Amino acid sequence: AIEQKKTEKVQIEKDKNLKETSLEKLKLKEQQLSAQLKEDERKKQELKRKVDVAIREEINKAKQREINRQKEKQRKKEEAKKGKSTQNTKTKNVKNDVAVNTKKVVTAESSEGSATGKNFANNKGRLPWPVNNGQITERYGRNSHPTLPGVSTVNNGIDITCSSGSKVRAVFEGEVSSVFSIPGSGKVVIIKHGGYMTVYSNLQEVYVSQGSKVSLKQSVGSLVNEGGVSSCHFEIHLISNGLPETLNPSLWLGGR
């Protein structure tokens, strides 16, 4: 009986040491996860900051273009009035030609942007995925952390985990508005589609440059390799009344 109690005591000590070791490993893992979470959050905030700056710059450019267009329109209007007062000997046909030409210029300038924005909006729920394969691993909005209880993160877009080095493609035709880098998080491409803008980040290589015209499903870059897999971060923004608004990409994407 004494020997049995000694054996039980030894076993209890082993179990106790094992539990303490497991607890230490668990604490260490939690610390590592917390550190990784902080780093991921830092990258998200840096991405958000740079995307906000890029979109704000695009909004300011659009405002300036509209101001310039209005100035040009006013200048032509004043020139037309001056021409009427100083050259009233012109024939009716010549006056009609001037009016027709002016009307054509105004129509060409005002129709392009609205047509592009309207087409993008009409494709809600039918846009192709930004990658050819993959699974959504973090959705738009607030997400609970998979291992840390009570911890959640906020996502301005969606994260799609896919094959290592996968190509990223434009979900709609448009023009490249910005290309920039995030330290430790690859490169970012922003494409404007009229009143909408799409964001593609975590890129290793970029195949387009600012001002480039892109077509539907055109490759814009390849993803960073993250231990045998890659993750594509994708966002959609709507510019309304000069203010940006994030949209849920899952509601816009359809088939691949």
Which residues does each predicted region cover?
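Zn2+-dependent peptidoglycan hydrolase active-site motif and core
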Residues: 153, 170-205
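Long, low-complexity, acidic/serine-threonine-proline-glutamine-glycine-rich intrinsically disordered tracts
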Residues: 67-132, 138, 142
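Terminal peptide-recognition signature
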Residues: 26, 136, 160, 174, ...
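Conserved, short, structured surface segments that act as functional micro-motifs
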Residues: 189-192, 210-256
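Short glycine/threonine/proline-enriched tight-turn/helix- or strand-capping micro-motif at secondary-structure
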Residues: 105-124, 137-170, 193, 231, ...
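Residue-level recognition of beta-strand microenvironments
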Residues: 139, 179-180, 223
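Alpha-helical oligomerization segments with coiled-coil/rod-like character
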Residues: 1-94
